[in-house]
C-alpha cells in the first residue's frame, strides 16, 4: 500500500465539506510521534469509511457567536472537552 493510495481513500471532492467535516486524519487519530505502517493506516481509513455519521456525531453541539473572543471560545471548548466550535448567528444558523 502506497502513500498515494491512502490519500485517494481520504480524498474529499468538495471544498465546502472541509468547512463542516473534521480532517480524515482527525477521525483515525493518526499517531504523530510513532511510525505506523501505511497498510495499517489504510486499514484504519477503510474502517472509518464504513462508520455512519450518526454513530460518532456529537449529540449536544456547543456553539459560539462570531463576536465572541478567542479566549472565551477556547474556554468553552476546554470546559466541554470539544475540539470544534461551530459559529452561529442570532437565529442559531451556521455562519459560513
Curated annotation (Swiss-Prot):
SUPFAM superfamilies: CBS-domain pair. This is Uncharacterized protein in nifH2 5'region. Disulfide bonds: none annotated. InterPro entries: CBS_dom, CBS_dom_sf, Diverse_CBS-Domain. It comes from Methanobacterium ivanovii. It comes from the Archaea. Keywords: CBS domain. Residues 57-96 form the CBS domain.
Amino acid at each position: 500500500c502506497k502513500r498515494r493510495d491512502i490519500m485517494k481513500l481520504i480524498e474529499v471532492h468538495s471544498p465546502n465539506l472541509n468547512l463542516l467535516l473534521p480532517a480524515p486524519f482527525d477521525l483515525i487519530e493518526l499517531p504523530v510521534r510513532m511510525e505506523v505502517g501505511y497498510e495499517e493506516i489504510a486499514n484504519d481509513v477503510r474502517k472509518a469509511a464504513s462508520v455512519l455519521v450518526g454513530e460518532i456525531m456529537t449529540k449536544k453541539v456547543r456553539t459560539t457567536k462570531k463576536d465572541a473572543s478567542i479566549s472565551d471560545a477556547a474556554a468553552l471548548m476546554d470546559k466541554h472537552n470539544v475540539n470544534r466550535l461551530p459559529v452561529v448567528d442570532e437565529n442559531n444558523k451556521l455562519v459560513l
